[in-house]
Amino acid sequence: MHGLLLAAAGLLSLPLHVIAHPQPSTNLAGRGVDLDAYRMADRSSYMNSDDMKLKQPGIASLSGGNYVDTATEVVKRMVPGMTFRMVDDHYVGESGISHVYFRQTMHGMDIDNSDFNVNIGKDGKVLSFGHSFYTGPAPDKAPVEKRDFSDPMKAFHGACKALNLPINADKATVQTMNEHEVMFMGTSGAMSDPQGKLCYMAKEDGTLALTWRVETDMGDNWLLSYVDAKETEKVHNVVDYVSHATYQVYRWPIPDPTEGKRETIENPWNLKTSPFTWISDGKTNYTTTRGNNAIAQANFDGGEDYLNNHRPNNKNLKFEYPYAPNMSPKSYIDASVTQLFYSANMVHDLYYMLGFTEKAGNFQVNNHGQGGKGNDFVILNAQDGSGTNNANFATPPDGKPGRMRVYIWTKAKPARDSSFEAGTVIHEYTHGLSNRLTGGPANAGCLNGMESGGMGEGWGDFFATAIRLKPNDNRNANYVHGEWVNNSPKGNRMYPYSTSLQTNPLVYTSCNKYNEVHAIGTVWGSMLYEVLWNLIDKHGKNDGPTPVFENGVPKDGKYLAMKLVMDGMAIQPCKPTFVQARDAIIDADMNLTKGSNRCEIWKAFAKR
């Protein structure tokens, strides 16, 4: 239900931190379009728990009733007179923090990049909140009343032309879904029928634009293009659900084929996190690489179909297939699909233990009454033919399947299959984690800014590195990203992850000279690597495959760091900055351990 209060102009009591970076030249799936030029600004504010006690004591002391009512009262007090709706993805996380999400509205329509998130602690009091609500002048009449917008088909053609999308729409028709949403039927070239939604968008110049949000799933890019509703040749911003990256070898338990031998593992699943096992969805038992959490198959042609693609099948459930690095990739495809399926399910189970559950928006077909939206396992495409020397992960909102494409790497002879590099799968899956947790499960576009997108890459590197740690490692251990797939000891990051400023000199101000998400992500990942070792030095390191908890808190520093970083994702605002994400991790520790690791976390960030 949409509120109908009048929107107020002026400034909110919280400052909006607008972060801008020069734009790199990242092409749109080889079609010569610089998607980074269309990124939204990271314009959220965040009120952490310390600041709130000082600056908003009335909000900090709010409690009573249920957490949804408390969160709604926070929004009403902080943005009086503004209209908004509650998004239907609120939940209580495994750490006891309640997360509630709101979207600003205007004349009954969403302002699509104006969000408010409120975090309620275990004690029922407000822990923190963040927002990016629009505060400028409001249009006096609803555009629907004035019909002051173009035909959606014109906007669709405008998006296709501006972004050079290979979609044929000569015979396309518009099917109305509701007052503000349409579907474009009869097109070809996209992986599903494109959709359109009439909505507002807050621009960087402080004004409001009426737009058609055109959604097109192109495989390597899943785009939300905000086309001006009057001047349909103008595209204001683009959100891409797909995260692209190059990756490193990580241990699960073996990092790559050079560091160990394959072994046969019996029943590797954890029934607490995968109660139907990995090869059932609770309704159907499978004899192939398909189950509740994922479906894995070959995708040699890089196409959209996956259900009918080849996957290994064995009625005795013996997924044992030959592989050697000197074999040609297609000759070991069954081993590749099996490895990819195994690694992705291992990630699912670990992340579930750390808090990425059904109600938090994880990827499962059957949520067996635990909350969230089901029917969204991860589609795992091995040896995907749509590219080489890369991998990507598409994260739509909760209830729609995620999609991981894993490519062949041609930098060695014979070529190398990144399904056998655990870090590739961990990094890619972590894009799904961070996009579902940040801003809530229903909002998968919160990490599309330059700084927030960089953190998305850094989180992927951090989790893969933490999982990769070896028993004898200490804080002097350095980890290079991408040695095996790149066939290079230097990998494909600027510097190794290291606690030495001589080995890795990256600091916060390094971001000023970088304008690409992987470079910025390496800075963020380096900060988190410092947090990791400060907590390990204090609490020790569990070298087992799963965390051990005491009263909901991991007993060791490695898994505690992973837990706090994950909780921070759920606490931080949509489109966070480095500072806001840091504060969210500190607030996560305040909630989980009453701040017992505050000094260790602060020292880690202060160093960088």
Swiss-Prot record:
Cofactor note text: Binds 1 zinc ion per subunit.
Transmembrane residue ranges: none
Keyword terms of this UniProt record: Glycoprotein, Hydrolase, Metal-binding, Metalloprotease, Protease, Secreted, Signal, Virulence, Zinc, Zymogen
Residues the record marks as active site: E428
Entry keyword annotation includes Hydrolase: yes
GO molecular function: metalloendopeptidase activity; zinc ion binding
Pfam families documented for this protein: FTP, Peptidase_M36
Binding site for Zn(2+): H427, H431
Cofactor(s) of this protein: Zn(2+)
Propeptide regions on this chain: 21-244
PROSITE patterns in the cross-refs: ZINC_PROTEASE
Top EC group: hydrolase
Function, as annotated: Secreted metalloproteinase probably acting as a virulence factor.
Protein name: Extracellular metalloproteinase 5
Organism the protein comes from: Trichophyton tonsurans (Scalp ringworm fungus)
Source taxonomy: Eukaryota, Fungi, Dikarya, Ascomycota, Pezizomycotina
Gene name for this UniProt entry: MEP5
